[in-house]
Amino acid sequence: MAEDVKAAMPQSILFQNEDRTVALIDVPRSIEEAQLLSSTEIISGVNSRRLVSSKPPDEPFRTPEPRNLIPNPDLAAAIADLTAAASIEQALKVLRDTYAGPWCLPRTLAPAEDVNGRKRKAAPAEEGNGVAERQGAASEPLIPEDSVYLQGTISAERARFLEEAPQFDLIVLDPPWPNRSARRKKDSYSTANNLDEIRETLSLIPIAAHLAPEGLVAIWVTNKPSVVELLTSARGLLSEWGLELIDEWTWLKVTTSGEPILDVNSAWRKPWERILIAKRRGSKRTKLPSQRKVLVSVPDLHSRKPNLRALFEDVFSPGYKGLEVFARNLTAGWWSWGDEALKFQQPEHWV
């Protein structure tokens, strides 16, 4: 029976091909499952609260293209975009050829608001989708089993981390990269003002001292060449941390019918984000079990990304030790660090 449970996929993984290079992930369910420690509970779905989410997009977003487009002078960035686009087209072909199910699971929706921000009744299209009633004043956050959190900035909590934190098999970072469009959005997460500021913050994280000898670091990055260069150049942060790149995953955002939410060939914005995966320099690990994985999801709220715990069980045994830096929710059995670590653990985000 234990073997059956181990072999079964979590409900959040709606599809995964045989070589595990393509995975369709339900973002809210991956975060819901991350609240649980027991693999039996995760697979069965029992005792799982539901996360309040946004309505999944049915149509691609329209974005204006620049009138006077200047060709990208960065050859490496142009090649990276072409490589990502080719991987995405292949992943979508795999899904369309072999998967006939839904592209996301039913969601628990927040109450709709009118243009003045006042709550109104759910629209007919939302009825029956598990529309959540917002709670009043926030009470105690919901803390998953065996999770540890450092609620505060990197500089404020660094001393405690150095004193108390163990070594981790996986360290996930979702840095607040400079992003003007995110800063313009209401209720958006805070971002760094510039790359110098975020580099200074990232340099404070003691990666080398707290990464297990054969551990991995997974870093969410935007598609800006300067962000990737900050990490991967000869004097970049990976070098500073004693790391070297071992793989790169792509997260593609799609509509409920499986169309990319933006034109793949758009010069302005891309429908994907990337995850750079690095190992210790000199590690015995040469590659991951599934190279250049493509994760496909219908997006949720702006700052939410799929929880990666289950996806790295291909690499580490279940129950491995993880840390998420710049976390916005907690994960059972993991450490979480950041000034928004409890953001989505507040009771009003759950039903």
Spans of features found by a protein language model:
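Class I S-adenosyl-L-methionine
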Residues: 1-173, 178-202, 224-351
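Short helix-terminating capping/connector loops at secondary-structure junctions
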Residues: 164-165, 209-214
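Short, basic/hydrophobic alpha-helical segments
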Residues: 200-211
